[in-house]
Amino acid sequence: MTYEEIAEMMEEMGLPFAYHHFAEGESPAPPFLLFLSPGENTFSADNLAYFSFKQLDVELYTNRKQPELEEQVEAVLAQHEIYYKKTELFIDSEELYEVLYEMEV
């Protein structure tokens, strides 16, 4: 997926979003999404790179547990036939829940 295709998919999730972080002072009230590509995995053989998979993280931030929003995000990922690993944590300093979806695209 290209950056543009990923951004279009993020639009489908129906929440404010940004790549990596919002500019200082521009962060919306929760819920919101962040996405980032922390790296790539390359398939290679015989000293040739045949294909590269982008790592993609989609982070859902909420001020309370909201399973319906998680389902909304997961429905979009399913529409795009994207397999993901899901984890969750509470960020004490921000008083926010983060649901992290890790995938390769």
Range-by-range predicted roles:
Residues M1-Q55, Y61-V105:
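Long, contiguous binding/interaction regions
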